[in-house]
Amino acid sequence: MISTPLDDLDRAILKLLKKDARLTIAEISNQLKKPESTVHFRIKKLQERGVIEKYTIILGEPIRPRELALVVLEVDKPIIEDFLDRYMEYVTKTLSGFPEVLFVAKSGKEKIVALVGGEDRDKLLKFIEENIESIPTLRSVQVLPISEIKKGDEISGFLAEV
């Protein structure tokens, strides 16, 4: 999973910061019953090693998309193989330009996976139909509406644009 070894203290610090990045060194130190100097040093080292890249926010429910869908796009294989790479790049950039598209990834040579969010189910499906399914030379578009999130509910709040 990760190539940088972490000990129990590093993991405990990361767990607390992941839950609330606003915690002060003193608060972390009190919760872990470790000296502030130790916690400060460890956080600094985690940043230097790239384990902590940045501190950010997760948007709350009032501003998150209410409906989500995974969209799997399969691109038609062109006669000239080089065109497939260019077209995949075009489609991923096009998708990335929409604020409703929260996440875009290539899967293999011909598939793209996107997480799309919307205010309600009708608007979400309309957006997908008008803006994604209309992209030329797609072999197929599979829309998988998400009915219930079992783990990672905050991801849409992290990915959503303001």
UniProtKB/Swiss-Prot annotation:
Pfam families attached to this UniProt entry: AsnC_trans_reg_3, HTH_24
UniProt keyword terms in alphabetical order: DNA-binding, Transcription, Transcription regulation
GO MF terms held by the record: sequence-specific DNA binding
Lineage top rank: taxon: Archaea
DNA-binding region: 25-44
CDD domains with a match to the protein in the record: HTH_ARSR
InterPro entries reported for this sequence: ArsR-like_HTH, AsnC-type_HTH_dom, HTH-Siroheme_Decarb, PF0864-like_C, Tscrpt_reg_AsnC-like, WH-like_DNA-bd_sf, WH_DNA-bd_sf
HTH asnC-type domain residues: 6-99
Protein name as it appears in the record: Uncharacterized HTH-type transcriptional regulator PH1013
Taxonomic lineage from the root: Archaea, Methanobacteriati, Methanobacteriota, Thermococci, Thermococcales
